[in-house]
Amino acid sequence: MALQQFGLIGLAVMGENLALNIERNGFSLTVYNRTAEKTEAFMADRAQGKNIVPAYSLEDFVASLERPRRILVMVKAGGPVDAVVEQLKPLLDPGDLIIDGGNSLFTDTERRVKDLEALGLGFMGMGVSGGEEGALNGPSLMPGGTQAAYEAVEPIVRSIAAQVDDGPCVTYIGPGGSGHYVKMVHNGIEYGDMQLIAEAYDLLKSVAGLNASELHDVFAAWNKTPELDSFLIEITADIFTKVDDLGTGQPLVELILDAAGQKGTGRWTVETALEIGVAIPTIIAAVNARILSSIKAERQAASEILSGPITEPFSGDRQAFIDSVRDALYCSKICSYAQGMALLAKASQVYNYGLNLGELARIWKGGCIIRAGFLNKIKQAYDADPTLANLLLAPEFRQTILDRQLAWRRVIAIAAERGIPVPAFSASLDYFDSYRRDRLPQNLTQAQRDYFGAHTYERTDRSGSFHAQWF
C-alpha cells in the first residue's frame, strides 16, 4: 500500500471535517482515533469512498505515513495533547512534525516545541478558527513554529484554508507558541464582539421595544453596511428568525437560558494582558459578563430585592435611537479591536514573535468567527503605518469616532438612566477617553502609594524619583 501524505489524530467533528477538507484538496491521509468505534463510524459514513485510510493503533498510523511525517493532532487541549505527544515520541523519526490544531495555551506549546526539538522532532501550534463549517470548507489558520516546519505543511494549509480576494487565510505567524497566542487573542476579540452585539440587542429590545422580526430587519440591514458587515452580525440576524420547534411559537432566542458558557481562551487573554501590562477593558468586560450571567439563580434572587430606576416608556425617535446604537456598536468595536491588536503588538515584543499585524487582519477576513469587512480597514491601517501605536490613531478610525462619539455617549447615558447594563460599551468609551487624555488622576494614586508605602514618585517638572515626608 502506498504511504499517505498526511496523518490526523482525533475524530471529533473538527477533526472529521478537517480530514475531509484535506482529502478534498488532493492529499491522501491516514486517520486515527483513540476509540476504534469512532474511526469505524467515520470510515463507514462520511469518509466512505475517499482517499482516507483508517489506522487502529498508533504504530500502524505512523507506519502508514510518508517521511518526513506530518501529523495533525485534534484533541482536547492540555493533558490529552501531552498524552498523544508522549505516545508518538518513540514512534517518530528525526525530522517528523506534529501539529497541534486545538486551542492549547501558548505556554504549553512553547514547552512542547522545546521538548521535541531536543529529540529532533518538529512541533507546531496552529490556531484553527471557523468552527465546524470552517473546518470543512475553509478555516482561518494560524500556524506557529519554525519557518522550516511551516514550509513542510505550507502546501496543505494553503490549500485547505479559506480563500479571500488577496489569498488564502493562512500565513506563517512566527516562532514558538505564536500561533496559539494569536488564536487566543482572536478568541478574546471574539468575546468582545459577541458581548457588544448582545448589548446592542438588549438596548434595541429593552429601550426601543423591537420584537424578533424587527430585530432581524435591523441586524440584516447593519450587515449590509461596510462597518458592520460580518459573520457575527449575519448569524445574529438569522437567530431572530428561528421559531421554537417545541410548540410554543415563540422566538427561540427568548427561550434560551441567559447563562453564557466559556472554554477558557477569553480568560487566558485577560490573564496574559495583565501579565505583560496591556489594557483590554472591553475584553475583560466581556469575560466578566459571561461570569455574571452564569450565576442565574443568584441574579434571580437579587432581582426581587434590588430595584433599578423607575423610567417612562421610550418616547423618542425610534429610528434615530437604532442609528445611535449602530454608531455606539461600531465605535466600541473599533476600541475592542484596538485593544486586541495592542496586546498582540506588545506580546510580539515580549516574546520575540515578529508578528505582522496587517497580515493577521488579512487572514481573519475569511473562514474565522470574527471575519468581517471591517478587517480590510485594519489591514490598510497597518499597511500604511506598520509601527502604528494604536488603531485609534489611524486616520479613518480616528475620524469615525470623532464623528460618532456623541451618539455613542448618548446611548450609554440612556442605558445608565434606565438601569440597563452595557459593560462592554462603557469599557470601550472609558478606554477611548482614557487613551485620549493628556493627564489622568493617577498622580493621586502615586501620592497615595508614596504616603503609605514609600514607593516614590516621579515629577512632571524634573527627572528622578522622589519621596515626600507626608506625616
Curated annotation (Swiss-Prot):
Keywords: Gluconate utilization, NADP, Oxidoreductase, Pentose shunt
Enzyme class: oxidoreductase
Pfam families named in the record: 6PGD, NAD_binding_2
Listed pathway(s): Carbohydrate degradation; pentose phosphate pathway; D-ribulose 5-phosphate from D-glucose 6-phosphate (oxidative stage): step 3/3
Catalytic residues in the record: 183, 190
SUBUNIT field: Homodimer.
Protein name: 6-phosphogluconate dehydrogenase, decarboxylating
Catalytic activity: 6-phospho-D-gluconate + NADP(+) = D-ribulose 5-phosphate + CO2 + NADPH
Enzyme nomenclature, EC number: 1.1.1.44
Binding residues annotated for NADP(+), in chain numbering: 10-15, 33-35, 75-77, 103
Family: Belongs to the 6-phosphogluconate dehydrogenase family.
Functional note: Catalyzes the oxidative decarboxylation of 6-phosphogluconate to ribulose 5-phosphate and CO(2), with concomitant reduction of NADP to NADPH.
Species for this entry: Synechococcus elongatus (strain ATCC 33912 / PCC 7942 / FACHB-805)
Binding residues annotated for substrate, in chain numbering: 103, 129-131, 186-187, 191, 263, 290, 449, 455
Protein's UniProt keywords contain Oxidoreductase: yes
GO biological process annotation, one example: pentose-phosphate shunt
Name of encoding gene: gnd
GO MF, one example: phosphogluconate dehydrogenase (decarboxylating) activity
